[in-house]
Amino acid sequence: MSYFDISGAVFNNQLRELETSDPAHADVFNAVFRQLINNDVALMEAASMFAGEKNKQAEFILNLKRTGKKYGVHHSAFDVSPLSAGTRTLDAVGMVAQPSTNTVRGRNDFEGESVFYGLEVNGHVDDAGEFIVEYIKGIDNEFSRTERDTWMLYLTQWINITIDANGESLVISDEHHAGFFPEGAAIRTDQTVRPFVAQAKYMAGNGSDGKAASISGVNAAHDQSHNGMITRFKAKGTQYCGTTAQDKNHMDNLFEVAFATRDSQSIMSGCTGYYNRFYATVVENNVERIIISKSDANNLVVGSTVSIGNATALSGSNPTDDRGNAGLHAKANRVIITKIEDYDSNNSAVYVDNGGTKFSTGSTMVGSTEVKTTIVTMPWHTGACDNVLGSCGSPNSNTSGKDPYILFGVEMFLGFYEVISNVILKISNHVMTACICYDCTKLATSVTSDYVECGYSIADTQESWKYISELGYDPENPSVRHGTKVAASSSTGYADGQYTNKLDQTSDGLREWLSGGYLSSWSLAGRWCAYLAAGLGYSWWSFAARLSASGRCAKAAA
């Protein structure tokens, strides 16, 4: 930008001069504008000068990222090659994607380009289901991650999927090429296509009004269920719902193309192996810390979330470690570890932010059994990844199993299953199929005429975890994908687990879609992990969701 003065009217006049002197050559101006892309100050300055209304400003910025390129990946069919790694195709050939941390920025050639670029904004969904931008990060001083719903905006994905005996090829682009279709989240109810789609940046906590909110620095609301979410999210407005299949599919496409593997945990594992309980070794009073052995403390991560308390029930003869037990949270409920320091040669002090409320780390009794004060790991607060240096990555380690991650700006895998709001799994005559509703105002606690059944059967895993080797695909409902074959392992195929009832022995019924895994899923977890054996009203401490802006869509574009 050494050739442009980007200050106020000077920058404005220079670009206007170019525009008026040669109005017929848009390609020239696009080339100039694209040089702004790597200069955030200039980019935001240009947006505010050339577009007044916020949605137009957002479109202006996103359109500068438009390349028209086709980014692809090919994966062999499992019986051709069980390898999880794919082969980059078309314009993705030669590109590199590496996740970052808070201290190391990985190389990511996709970052900031085309459909992979995310614009961070505050906004809301209007009554018609359209996303309205309120404030844009970098332009508006009013922008806030903590006080207003925060979203990532992306250019609409145009998708081409080819599946044959050799495998599956996925191609995404920011332009409509022959044979491509728009992603589900972008299709309006009138079948026109939105220029961009919005993804909630954070799992949904509660805002100051007590309603679902996509904000940083809070506990995501837990104990969610398919049925419970209908009520919870509609309290914000009938145009809202929890995470949709379209939301999930959007992010899955970005991951699969950018990182060219189906084994998502090999790149970023998320908080999927951080299920710990440690006992106090020294009793203290009037403190906001707990003393535990050094070896135990070495397993904990500063910045992560824990609870401190005494179990009020036993599991066999021992105190329960089920996080659903209220006693485990009675002294410090889902609080952040602020520091860990040596206490003596054998023990460490783990400090937490309990808002100034002090507690004792003494024992209690359950019957005749002594129950020591314990510290248990819990899902992270939202905003845990706010300091990651790139658009993808984890705070400390991408593959330890202890950290959540962001994927092109969207934070996920805090330690919760993510409940999908607009899909119901139906068991009929011992066969499970997925049914999707494209209008969140019509979400129901049963499969009604507003739901569309997908055209494939889901693999019966016989009440055991099995690893997905092939996902079903219905071109009429392309956002909904579940395992139809489960012959893989933790390091082959999709490398993610799927769980169903014994369908051959199960009566007709309905199940919710729990996606991704939780604190204790370990190698079963990942982008395609699915627990499909819980009823629609079943909730648990490890179930959460995010706001969706794609609740009101059509099945297909005109």
Predicted segments — roles?
Residues 1-49:
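Extracellular "spike/adhesin" assembly and maturation modules
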Residues 16, 307, 418-419:
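Hydrophobic beta-strand signal
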Residues 42, 157-159, 203-204, 247, ...:
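Acidic glycine-/aspartate-rich tracts in secreted/extracellular proteins
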Residues 54-153, 161, 300, 350, ...:
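GGW-centered surface loops in extracellular recognition modules
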Residues 61-63, 69-71, 75-80, 337, ...:
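C-terminal, surface-exposed recognition/capping segments
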Residues 101, 143, 149-191, 196, ...:
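Carbohydrate-recognition beta-sandwich/jelly-roll modules
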Residues 141, 145-147, 179-311, 323-413:
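Short aromatic-cysteine micro-motif
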Residues 427-439:
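A short, polar/charged loop-to-alpha-helix boundary motif
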